[in-house]
Amino acid sequence: MAAGGATAAGATVFANRCAVCHGPQAAGIPGSFPSLHEQVVAFAKVPEGRDYLVMVVTTGLMGALKVGGVSYNGVMPAQSGLSEAEIAAVLSYLASDLGRNEAGAPALSAADVSAARARHPDKSAQSTRALRPATES
């Protein structure tokens, strides 16, 4: 898929699945829903971060974490029903800072999503937290 097509597909998945909680610009709501900007871009630049992002979308996420110095302790539901191509598209869209920075992080492919799922077949919303790369916040 061409970069523009991938961005459009990712934007559509984001609008339909993510924006209701994280907001239309992915800024989040402090204390309730984290921003999806800086950390998603940073995570998408490293293999372990890419696996974490794929598994968060696949399994959901439960437990305490900090994003930008703000604490969160909630539940993100698994985004069931998304194809590997849709997961790749939405994560690539987020990793490019909502399509504004194509050089933000490498795009993910459906094959990347499939490989991450194969590496972590037994993850759940609770155990996916352990995949999260260390961050300064």
Predicted regions and their residues:
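Stable alpha-helical elements in mature extracytoplasmic
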Residues: 6-10, 49, 53, 86-87, ...
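Flexible coil segments in periplasmic/lumen-exposed cytochrome c-class electron-transfer proteins
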Residues: 1-4, 67-68, 74, 78-137
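Electrostatic cytochrome c docking/interface patches
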Residues: 1-15, 28, 32, 42-44
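Short, flexible coil/turn micro-motifs enriched in small/turn-prone residues
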Residues: 5, 18-23, 55, 64
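Hydrophobic aliphatic residue packing
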Residues: 13, 56, 60, 87-90, ...
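Gly/Gly-Pro-rich "capping" loops immediately C-terminal to redox-active cysteine motifs
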Residues: 27-65, 73-83
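The canonical Cys-X-X-Cys-His
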Residues: 10-24, 76, 90-94
